[in-house]
Amino acid sequence: MDNIPNLTILEHSRISPPPSTIGHRSLPLTFFDIAWLLFPPVHHLYFYHFPYSKSHFTETVIPNLKHSLSITLQHYFPFVGKLIVYPNPHDSTRKPEIRHVEGDSVALTFAETTLDFNDLSANHPRKCENFYPLVPPLGNAVKESDYVTLPVFSVQVTYFPNSGISIGLTNHHSLSDANTRFGFLKAWASVCETGEDQPFLKNGSPPVFDRVVVNPQLYENRLNQTRLGTFYQAPSLVGSSSDRVRATFVLARTHISGLKKQVLTQLPMLEYTSSFTVTCGYIWSCIVKSLVNMGEKKGEDELEQFIVSVGCRSRLDPPLPENYFGNCSAPCIVTIKNGVLKGENGFVMAAKLIGEGISKMVNKKGGILEYADRWYDGFKIPARKMGISGTPKLNFYDIDFGWGKAMKYEVVSIDYSASVSLSACKESAQDFEIGVCFPSMQMEAFGKIFNDGLESAIAS
C-alpha cells in the first residue's frame, strides 16, 4: 500500500478502545451472519469538502478522528475484534464468532493524494481504478493451530490538498449489515463533532448485542452449507481494470412516479408496487439492454436473476430493534428469461416479479422465517446474477464529522460483486442515487438507455 501511485502515506495507526472498557468479549455469529462468511469485503467511500491546509488536517483532524474512533469502539466492540473461524468440517462443537481481547486494535491509515477531488466526487463516468487507493485492505487471515483469525474492519482517511477529505471503510460482511454500519458511523461522527460520547448515548441508540434470534436447525444447515475449509485466504482488495468506469445516476421523484405509472397502466391489478421495486426493475432491464446494445448474443430462454436483500428486524416475531447488531436480512431471488427482460415490456415484468417476490416473502403465514432453509436455493440455478447493494432507507449523506454532510457516497465494492448501489440522494431523501460500474462503452450505452427511458416515462 505504501507504493500506490498518487498516494502518500502520512501515518499508520492502530486504534484501540480506552483501556479496560471492554475486556474479553465475544459475539457469536447467527445464521444471518454465517451466510456472508465467504463473501469478499465491503468497501465504502465518503467524500467531504475540506478547503483547509495540510497542517490543519494533521494537527486537528487526525487527532480528533483517532480520539473519537477510540471512544466509539468501546460501544461497538465487534468492530475492533477479530473473526474466529474453525475450518475443520468434522468439528461441530466450535462455532464462528467475533472475539475481542484486551489490546485489539483497528488499522487506521492517514494518507495524502494528488487525485482530483472534484472529479472523484462527481456523478459522471470516472475510472474505477482511481478509487481503489482510497479504500484500505482489510488485513490478512492468520492460521492458528486449528482456527483462522481475520480482522473485520479498517479505515483510511485521505487528504486532498485544500479541497477535500475521503473516508474509506472496509469491513467483513459477516460483521454487520447496512443498518449496523450506519449506526456505527452516526456514533463515530457524533463523537468526532462533539468530542464526547454523551450526546450519542443520549440521542442515539447504542447497539443491542443480545443474540435473541435462535434457530438451531437453520444455523446448522447454513453452517454445513458454508465451505469453511476455503476460508483461509487472504482477502484481496478490488482489482484494477483500466477500461472500467463508475458513474452515478439520479432517479428523481418525478421519474419514479412515471415508472410506477407505466407499471400500473399495463398491470392495473398488480397487488404490490413501490419506488424500490420499480427502480430495481428499471435498472435491471437497462443493464441487460445495454449488453444487447454491445452485441451480446444470449438465448431467449437463458435465465437472468436479480437479488435484493429484505430486512428482517421488524418482520421477526418478536421483532428486533433497529439497533440490533449484526446482519438481519434475507435474499429475495427473482428469475426471468433473458428474452422477456430485454423485450419492450422487460422493465414492467421485472418490477412485477421483484414486487411479487418481496410480497410473498414478507407475507408468509408462518412469518418471514418460514421456508428460510430454502432462501439460498435460487443461487444454484444457472443464471446470470445481479443485485442491489444498499438501501435508500438509510441516508449515509447525513453522516457529519464536523465538516458538513458528505458530498458524495460511493460503494466501491460493487466493482467486483456484480451489484448496483442504491441510496438516498444527497439533495433529497425521496430521490434515489444509483451507482454502477461497467466497461466504458457499456456505460455509454447504459446511460443512453437509462435517460431515454426516463424521458419516455415522464412523457407518458
From Swiss-Prot:
NADP as UniProt keyword: no
Gene Ontology molecular function, alphabetical: anthocyanin 6''-O-malonyltransferase activity
Pfam families: Transferase
Temperature dependence (free text): Stable below 45 degrees Celsius for 20 minutes at pH 7.0.
Regulation (activators, inhibitors): Completely inhibited by 5 mM N-ethylmaleimide or 0.1 mM Cu(2+). Partially inhibited by 0.1 mM Fe(2+) or 0.1 mM Hg(2+).
InterPro entries: CAT-like_dom_sf (IPR023213), Plant_metabolite_acyltrans (IPR051504)
Sequence intervals crossing the membrane: none
EC number per UniProt: 2.3.1.171
Record-linked Gene3D superfamilies: Chloramphenicol acetyltransferase-like domain (3.30.559.10)
Catalytic activity line of the entry: an anthocyanidin 3-O-beta-D-glucoside + malonyl-CoA = an anthocyanidin 3-O-(6-O-malonyl-beta-D-glucoside) + CoA
Keywords: Acyltransferase, Phenylpropanoid metabolism, Transferase
GO process terms (BP): phenylpropanoid metabolic process
Summary of pH dependence: Optimum pH is 8.5. Active over the pH range 5.5-11.0. Stable from pH 6.5 to 7.5 for 20 hours at 20 degrees Celsius.
Active site (record annotation): H173, D400
Entry similarity comment: Belongs to the plant acyltransferase family.
Function recorded in the entry: Catalyzes the transfer of the malonyl group from malonyl-CoA to pelargonidin 3-O-glucoside to produce pelargonidin 3-O-6''-O-malonylglucoside. Can also transfer the malonyl group from malonyl-CoA to cyanidin 3-O-glucoside, delphinidin 3-O-glucoside and quercetin 3-O-glucoside.
Protein name listed in UniProt: Malonyl-coenzyme A:anthocyanin 3-O-glucoside-6''-O-malonyltransferase
Species for this entry: Dahlia pinnata (Pinnate dahlia)
